Amino acid sequence: MIKVGIVGGTGYTGVELLRLLAQHPQARVEVITSRSEAGVKVADMYPNLRGHYDDLQFSVPDVQRLGACDVVFFATPHGVAHALAGELLDAGTRVIDLSADFRLADAEEWARWYGQPHGAPALLDEAVYGLPEVNREKIRQARLIAVPGCYPTATQLGLIPLLEAGLADASRLIADCKSGVSGAGRGAKVGSLFCEAGESMMAYAVKGHRHLPEISQGLRRASGGDVGLTFVPHLTPMIRGIHATLYAHVADRSVDLQALFEKRYADEPFVDVMPAGSHPETRSVRGANVCRIAVHRPQGGDLVVVLSVIDNLVKGASGQALQNMNILFGLDERLGLSHAALLP
């Protein structure tokens, strides 16, 4: 049985991680931390978990207790894992970080986007970017895994086949992405209030979103060179989901793009390339660790449109983190994640 610790268990990614781990046959949550809710039972805060974690209580972070776990997940704001990851690694505990702390390879670039110095630059070289469809073999050997963000997951999975094949003009990529409100986190913010977010949609961070350098980094690795990406995120009045509409110029009209995508993801348990002409819906992935993709070439022209949908809390966060844990410990990566999406 894998002994699991969770740092930061009161946010949406934390409770989603608890929900998924409750169904995992080879993992047990030993420690879950929250400074603000220390002493409170998990099942009292989250009634949906009654019967699964009736005796588990939130506690103040304790490196000794966390270090006794086989793996520790960080479901925290950026900056927290910087302070604790090194000590846990020294104790022999593996770390899976759902925050942005170790996603970017360049400490200076991280500091520019997050407005503070990187707190653990010495760990960046060994941090493995946890996108299994790209880095599965590296994940198997990792001590420290950086779980990709939600927008980066949907965008990279949608564009990588075109870039790996050298088909797309990498200098003119567009990612037009929509997110549910849970992507903004559980903290109280005016923009997330029902009367603000309901029955409305808006773009934000058009000048530059923190996920932009992460997406660009992944696309550069796929293409083997520089990329030019315009990324525009939007907030939509739904709770869960990411819908990415991706645009790339592909001059070669003889390529069977449907076959290209089907071949690239043929052995991927959590990527579903839908039949030609499909329009994937966010509701088709709600609660599931799956990315559904459809590829289109409107009017048979040079502009290719890829539609990519995920649940931002599952394949975009906690489900992908659990998928990484399964790979890390040599398990079937579908373990605890094979359930169907919720519908309606």
Curated annotation (Swiss-Prot):
Group of enzyme by EC: oxidoreductase
Gene3D superfamilies: Dihydrodipicolinate Reductase, domain 2, NAD(P)-binding Rossmann-like Domain
SMART domains linked: Semialdhyde_dh (SM00859)
PROSITE patterns according to UniProt: ARGC (PS01224)
InterPro entries: AGPR_AS, AGPR_type-1, NAD(P)-bd_dom_sf, NAGSA_dehydrogenase, Semialdehyde_DH_NAD-bd
GO molecular function: N-acetyl-gamma-glutamyl-phosphate reductase activity; NAD binding; NADP+ binding
Pfam families in UniProt: Semialdhyde_dh (PF01118), Semialdhyde_dhC_1 (PF22698)
Pathway: Amino-acid biosynthesis; L-arginine biosynthesis; N(2)-acetyl-L-ornithine from L-glutamate: step 3/4
The keyword Ribonucleoprotein belongs to this UniProt entry's keyword annotation: no
Assigned GO CC terms: cytoplasm
Reactions catalysed, as given in the entry: N-acetyl-L-glutamate 5-semialdehyde + phosphate + NADP(+) = N-acetyl-L-glutamyl 5-phosphate + NADPH + H(+)
EC number(s) per entry: 1.2.1.38
UniProt-listed GO biological process terms: L-arginine biosynthetic process
Family: Belongs to the NAGSA dehydrogenase family. Type 1 subfamily.
NCBIfam families for this protein: argC
HAMAP family in the record: ArgC_type1
Function per UniProt: Catalyzes the NADPH-dependent reduction of N-acetyl-5-glutamyl phosphate to yield N-acetyl-L-glutamate 5-semialdehyde.
Name of this protein: N-acetyl-gamma-glutamyl-phosphate reductase
Lineage: Bacteria, Pseudomonadati, Pseudomonadota, Gammaproteobacteria, Pseudomonadales
The encoding gene: argC
